Every structure is written in structure tokens, then in C-alpha cells.
Amino acid sequence: MRRIVILLILQIIATGFCFGQLPHTFTQYTSEDGLSQNTIMSILQDDKGVMWFATWDGLYKFDGYTFNNYKAHPGDSIGLSNNRLDNIKEDRYGYIWVQSYNHQVYRFNPRLERFQAIPYDNYLSLDMYVLPCGDVWIITVQNELIHISTHPETHEMKATDFFKSHQISYSEPIKSIFQDSRENQWILTENGLYRLTRNGNEEKLSSYFVAPPEKDKQPFYDALENNHTIYFTSKQGCVYEYNPDTGQFVRQEFPTGSSIKTIRQLKKDKLFIGTASDGFFVYEQSSGNHRHYNTRNYPSLKDNQIKAVYIDTNGEAWIRLNTKGVTHFNPENEQFDHFILQDKYGKDIVDSRPEMYIYEDVNGSLWVHPSGGGLAWYDRKNNRIRPFYNPALQSGWSADNKVTNVFTDKQGNFCLLYTSDAADDKA
């Protein structure tokens, strides 16, 4: 049985649709079109509209017609040491930042078509944040935090160990990095918050809730800014509200002993506040009132572990729980719907991939990859998810068809990458 990987680019037509399917045209790309690698790990569209793919055989560029491949060859000077790439992001200057399988980070110059290693030695990257201000942060396996700034005119990179450069004698695990509307950069750690403020060439670092190593630590997990307030989530039901004008924090306590891992904006002045093990809260900012949604209060909720959440343009929540599938929550009528796709044999798809992907395109279509597998679009009128696939290649989804990546571009095209057993495909 031959395994093949297929990249489908779908053009969705923004008109009325027939029941059960969206009007669309498929364009299929395989190795015959120049996309020779069968594992694509990350997709982005740059500010010029060009598509980029991080693969296990280097970096691919797609201009809408042809694929170009950039990778290391023996004896060349391209600047890349490992062709297996895991993650790509674009910065404000148009460079493509690349994270490789051997935990190194490179900056790719699309104009010169060259990779450049960051000016930092002896590190192993774990995660990478590329902020709108142009700065890049790299969290390392060794629990270092590398801060990379780019000169706005020469584009020269400067990399420093954040903790050492600010005389911080001990480092803590990094939970997230966040940039606010004033271009302050916040580092959320297992032990407090740090805020980096830049004024020209001058930098100022402020710390909040940082305790000595032997004291009880205050971790921070997620951040959200709105209405002149920045919200930081923490442990034991705490959310800290920061006022940028006064520099003051106010602590909000929710009735739960669970850590609050997620905060998102709903419609109007409501917030979705998700916990690690006790469901979620809907918090009304103007009144300070909240409502607690967990399996005790709402038995239709499958479990209490909020793994991830996406808020769509209608202000409705799509939640990944520990239970496979996807949970849809409408805050207006407080209705829960749990969806799980079935394969072409009528069985629930639960063993394909654990991730939940939710994407909305410019035409207003909402695409759902439930935890467990498969791909569907949301039929909002009938409140159903409808399986979506190419009938020329498949008779339906199965556990062997693994969606490895999805992406919607600025033109409304939907990129779908999945593996398939050739023996099961239609001609």
C-alpha cells in the first residue's frame, strides 16, 4: 500500500451553496508539480501574497504557479545545516524565520534567497515568538530566553540572553510572550511577569510578582488586551487586570481552585475564561458578573479540561476538550453541541490526529478539524458540521487519511494537506 501526500488548494465560491457541500474548485499539487516533500509542518502567506511551506526537505515557496525549493546541499553556502524544518514565521521586515528539527533557528532572506544563523552559540530552541514590533524571542531546551532585535535600517541581528543581560540570577519556565498595543513586550513565566519597554535605543525592564526561589510562585499563562486593560491569567482562579495608564494591577478571583489557562474575547464586553480542569467562565466586564460552565452545572459539557478554544466572528466558542471531537458553545442561548466526524464506514474518527484546527476564510466559511481527525465545514443554518473532501480522490474520511495541516489565505483559498493510502484512492 503506497502512502501519498496531497496538497489541495480549494477556491471557495462566495455565493449560495447546495446542502451538504460548498461550491468550490479543487487544485491538487503533488511531487509532479515540484512539491517533492511529503511532510509539510508549517504554512504561511507573506505580506506579498507568496505562500511558504516548511517541510522535511527544506523551505518551499509557491507563487501561485510554481514551487521553488531552498535547502542545504553538500558544499554550498546557503547557510542551512538541516533541511528538516518544523516552523516558519514572517517578521515585520519581510524575513522568514525558520525553526529546524535540530533545534536551530535561521532567518531566511527572500530577496537574496539565503539563510542566516542567529548570532548565538550553543542553544537548542524549544519555541519561537515573532512579535509585530520586529523582535524575536526563542525559548530554549536549557530554559534560556534568547532575545533577538533587528536594526530597523541595516537589519543586523543582535541576540542576547535575556535573563543574564538583565542580571536576573535565575530563570523560570516561560509560559508565553505577549506584545501590547504600546509595543511593550511581556514575558509570562512560572514565577511572575516581566515587561520590556523600549524608548529609542533605551530599554527598561520591570518585574511583577516575582518571588525568591524558596517562596510560593505566581505563574502566568495567557494574556489579552482590550478596553485599555490587559488581562493576565494565573493559578487558583486568579486573573490580574493591568491598567497601562496607572501601572496598577487588580486581582479578580473566580470560584475555582483550577489554574486559568486561556482568556479570549467574546462579543460585546464578555470574556471566555478557560480553566485547566474546571470548565470555563463567561465574564461580563461592565458589571463584573460571571457564569461558571462545568459538567456539574451543565451536564451537556463533555468534560472540564479546556485544552484550546477558538472564538469565531459570530462570537461563538469552539472548544477542544480532553474528549475527542469539538464542542461548540453559543453564549447567546448557552447551548452546547459536541461534534465528531464519522468515517466512510460510519465509525467515529478518534484516532487520526489529536489537534483541533479551526479556520475562517474571507468568504465567511468556517472550517473544522475536530480533535480525532477529519475535516468539515460548519453549516451554521442547520447547526451541523458537514464532512468535506475531494470526491475525485476519496469516498470519505478514514483513520488512514490524516490531515497534517490546513491554512486559509487572504484571497479565500483554503490549503489542505493530508496523507492518504493510494490503494484506497479513486483514480
Question: What residue spans do the PLM features occupy?
Answer:
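Carboxylate-rich, polar loop motifs that coordinate divalent cations or form catalytic acidic clusters
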Residues: 1-421
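A short, hydrophobic C-terminal helix/tail in secreted or cell-surface proteins
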Residues: 421-427
